[in-house]
Amino acid sequence: MSRTMLLAASAALLLTGSCYQSSPDASRQAPPASYYDNSGHPDAWSGGARKITISTLKGPHQVWIKRVGNNPKLKLLLLTGGPGLSHAYLEVMDSYLPAAGIEYYHYDQLETGESDRPNDPDLWTLARYVDEVDQVRRAIGGTKDNFCLLGHSWGGLLAMEYALAHQDQMKCLVISNMMASIPAYNRYAKTVLEPRMNQAALKQILSMEASGKTEQPQYMQLLMPNWYEQHILRRPAAQWPEPVLRAQENMNRRFYVTMQGPSEMGASGRLVNWDRFADLKTITIPTLVVSGKYDTMDPAYMAAMAKQLPHGELAATNGGHMDMYDDQPTYFARLIAFLRKVE
């Protein structure tokens, strides 16, 4: 998303003061006192935040994490989307997971947010990011008895790759709003979503993509009402939450374009041929698949993923790609129920 469009959305938010809000269920029980016991944690003196040194083929780098809560039976690591987005937009978890007594970790992957940004495309491979996640797991004390991953969008892709390599070190997996195939994702956009769009706007969007004008303000001005507000976060841009705007404004655009491609309506970068659907049957840990009715991810395909997984479970929401915002009641009720069940 362009800085111009983000500033416009931010200004509209300030003027209207009408950010969408959904309050957590006040009837939920408070977590036990032990949830707030920070003794023994290396981040106890810093509000849960710290940096972890990871090793790469290009030398050591530091990545930022922040722990919330204390629950030895369940450590949930959050993998953000993009690629290139920071942890900021998943701060919505702070409104729900503490009351459920879930220990979880915000995390900026290398090249994003508060983590190091070496700006080195040689480090932008799935295998290296899988290794990075494994180093973070070890640093937070994650084991097969307590470690769970929640990956959203690109983070869901990364979570699937991690599970295929290291499910012996996992307790559970949450695939949030990510299909197991980029070719299938592209087909859904081209054959289902694009025909439903305003065709005059679509023609302009495709023309700008073909001529390499995706960084111009007009591109996002067309995409915001015709794509983002329909499929990404189903609220007017003036109501988009501040954490979402902050994550987008701080996005590593070069990383995103290299992996995803310049188009917002399909992938053409390094991930273009990624497909793991056939391998899902080998993931035997409990897995929740979250699917939004209006998402850019095909709901029927997401349902098939849940069936392909031996212990898969589908959570169908009435939201878009960020249904943790635009259908919070369903998203968090299903997520928390799943985590409590595997805990």
List where the protein language model places each region:
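N-terminal cap/lid segment of alpha/beta-hydrolase-fold proteins
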Residues: 38-62
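Conserved HGGG/HGGXW glycine-rich cap/lid loop of the alpha/beta-hydrolase fold
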Residues: 61-117
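Active-site loop/oxyanion-hole signature of alpha/beta-hydrolase fold enzymes
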Residues: 109-150, 154
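Conserved hydrolase catalytic core segment
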Residues: 145-188
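Flexible "cap/lid" loop of the alpha/beta hydrolase fold
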Residues: 173-214
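Alpha/beta-hydrolase
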Residues: 203-281, 285
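Conserved loop-alpha-helix segment in the C-terminal half of the alpha/beta-hydrolase fold
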Residues: 277-319
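Catalytic active-site module of serine/aspartate enzymes centered on a nucleophile-bearing elbow/loop
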Residues: 311-343
